[in-house]
Amino acid sequence: MTFAIPSRQVSLELTLDKRYCGPYLTARLVNRQVEYMSTSGLSRARLGHMHDVMAGYVERGEVPGIVTLVCRRDEVHFDAIGTKMVGGRDPVRRDTIFRIASMTKPITAAATMILVEECKLRLDEPVDRLLPELADRKVLKRLDAPLEETVPAERPVTVRDLLTFRMGFGVVIAPPGTYPIQRAVSELLLFQGPPQPQAPPAPDEWLGRLGTLPLMHQPGAKWMYHTGSDVLGVLIARASGQPFETFLRERLFEPLLMKDTGFSVPAAHLDRMATSYWTNPATGAFELYDPAEAGQWSRPPAFPSGGGGLVSTVDDYLAFGRMMLNRGKYGNERILSKASVETMTTDQLTPEQKAVSGLVAGYFDSHGWGFGVSVVTRREDLAGSVGRFGWDGGLGTSWYSDPREDMVGILMTQRAWTSPNPPDVRSDFWTSAYQAIDD
């Protein structure tokens, strides 16, 4: 049969799949797939515009391939454009595997809350009981101080501090090596930059090295990105008595049917993995960051990073995004309590903490931070629906769930961000998704 959209006719192959978001129609074209909704309140013409905008990035050579998904009111629009590698012929598909980088952080936070619900962890408990390496912290007198110039921590680091990135240690917004503490982090292979799963040591050794360094700020004083999620991965393993990756698989990935999500890709599935690129700042050209075959995700890592180590597919992450949107339920199974999800997606930062924090100037004027997720607190653009929550991955991915619009959106590319400011493809995806709402 055919289905009309402005200036084009497409042949449709009808499918029915209730696993992720309910029934949908599938339109198959050369090197792309598009799914159109009937009752989602999304304009078909405007969805066509979103495809054209995304296709422009591939046609201009800015990314080799893009996968997008918008799910509203339990119906899906899916689009796959381009190829898995520069100059390649194998197209990106619905089951293409992507390195999701910091989109790992919300999953780590959800896993932590499972243990909080089971009373194996408590939000305001010091982490010293399970992480003695972080007991009796010292704190730098100032960020640029030598490592030996410290004062005692005013209080212990808590589980809540890790979830909200207020442990007093994290990414420093300054050129690498500017401060002694940055140089020490690099020398100890603690890694706060783009994911390098084969580089860090095993979890106990990693935490032991972290424990030799002073904190950068007093616990609870400032939001500092990233490190809290990596520490949570170690904490989850010790609190559960299982390896971190095993806990994620048994308590999240298997119940959510996230069969392609993990810290490495099995050899049999490497042909489905997209190649990862970064941008040479001098030339603006693509350069290889990680290949699929024999790359860093082709074998299990010594350190499964709770801050950025996972790979996934658009459908796998949709299952997680829908669970969060449904306040902890996936189908008939409850993964998290309603109270846990509401706590995770509530802004936890005080005005004083926001005033001295952030990756980008002004970010916390319209956003807050919950447990592992950003939360929109004030609308300032098309996509800034108040209450929308989610996070991005610096290797080229993005996810947000929007309770007000009953919508989940996911963008998957594999061209790394060049700065903390989001790339145009990410901004244009979210603008295009929200401009398509037509009710």
Question: What residue spans do the PLM features occupy?
Answer:
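Ala/Thr-enriched low-complexity intrinsically disordered regions
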Residues: 2-4, 15, 26-27
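Compositionally biased, intrinsically disordered low-complexity segments enriched in Pro/Arg/Gln/His
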Residues: 8-9
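Short, conserved catalytic-motif segment at the N-terminal edge
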Residues: 39-100, 120-122, 137-148, 420, ...
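Active-site SXXK
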Residues: 48, 54, 74-76, 99-127, ...
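Short, surface-exposed loop or secondary-structure junction motifs
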Residues: 78, 138-386
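Acidic helix-start/capping segments at beta-turn-to-alpha-helix junctions
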Residues: 128-136
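Short, surface-exposed beta-strand/loop micro-motifs that present aromatic residues
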Residues: 396-404
